């Protein structure tokens, strides 16, 4: 395990690891214990009581956070004809078809999200082995395989985040930056928590949300007592 820096060690002393904090207090403490010199990302981590090995306990989706994430997403759209024009008008950073597939095959990745119309998925599938490991493959569950390209682009630019349970039953999602006002981070947290609750698989047994923590890019995790706020 890598040795923690002096600033991290000092920051970690401010967090009681045995305590679950009120969400507002957890957010404030996360900002206070941030050790990065840049505008670090604030992330929420969920440990869930699901078995991701089972198909009926997979959790994946997307949600638009009310206050965005603080990051400008570069959107690549695979579309043709009128849908390509619609994507350009909606503010997509890149729009094309086989030309961009060729660029990606050559190692180009100057984008954050891909949106593709369903009729383009046959072509996009050719680079699935490249996109998949990077988490960039478009998927209907996250609204990135759609003919409603204007809506998809608008949501992504407004702060849409994707979430997916990993092999260990955890979900990590960015909810903003340390420069955000506390209230905005709390609102984003609440939206994300509500979304995860609604995504509970019917096959999941026992305690669903086992643990929730908030952390910054280079700061210690702060455990959250989810009972201290009202979920919508």
UniProtKB/Swiss-Prot annotation:
The keyword ATP-binding does not apply. Gene3D superfamilies: 3.30.190.20, 3.40.50.790. One of its GO terms (biological process) is regulation of translation. GO terms for cellular component: large ribosomal subunit. Coiled coil: none annotated. GO terms for molecular function: rRNA binding; structural constituent of ribosome; tRNA binding. Pfam families: Ribosomal_L1. Keywords: Repressor, Ribonucleoprotein, Ribosomal protein, RNA-binding, rRNA-binding, Translation regulation, tRNA-binding. The keyword Nucleotide-binding does not apply. Belongs to the universal ribosomal protein uL1 family. Binds directly to 23S rRNA. The L1 stalk is quite mobile in the ribosome, and is involved in E site tRNA release. Part of the 50S ribosomal subunit. This is Large ribosomal subunit protein uL1. It comes from Bacillus velezensis (strain DSM 23117 / BGSC 10A6 / LMG 26770 / FZB42) (Bacillus amyloliquefaciens subsp. plantarum). The lineage of its organism: Bacteria, Bacillati, Bacillota, Bacilli, Bacillales. The gene is rplA.
């Amino acid at each position: 395990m890598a040795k923690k820096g002096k600033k991290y060690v000092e920051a970690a002393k401010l967090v009681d690891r045995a305590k679950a904090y009120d969400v507002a207090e957890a957010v404030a403490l996360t900002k206070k214990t941030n050790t990065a010199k840049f505008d670090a990302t604030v992330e929420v981590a969920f440990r869930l009581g699901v078995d991701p090995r089972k198909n009926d306990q997979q959790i994946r989706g997307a949600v638009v956070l009310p206050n965005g994430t603080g990051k400008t997403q570069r959107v690549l759209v695979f579309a043709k004809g009128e849908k390509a024009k619609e994507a350009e008008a909606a503010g997509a950073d890149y729009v094309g078809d086989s030309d961009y597939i060729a660029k990606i095959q050559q190692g180009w990745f100057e984008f954050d999200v891909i949106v593709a119309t369903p009729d383009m998925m046959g072509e996009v599938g050719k680079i699935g082995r490249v996109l998949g490991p990077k988490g960039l493959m478009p998927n209907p569950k996250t609204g990135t395989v759609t003919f409603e390209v204007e809506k998809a682009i608008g949501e992504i630019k407004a702060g849409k985040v994707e979430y997916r349970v990993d092999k260990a039953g955890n979900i990590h999602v960015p909810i903003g930056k340390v420069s955000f006002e506390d209230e905005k981070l709390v609102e984003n947290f609440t939206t994300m928590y509500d979304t995860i609750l609604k995504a509970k698989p019917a096959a999941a047994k026992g305690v669903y949300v086992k643990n929730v923590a908030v952390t910054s890019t280079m700061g210690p995790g702060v455990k959250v007592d989810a009972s201290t706020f009202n979920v919508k």
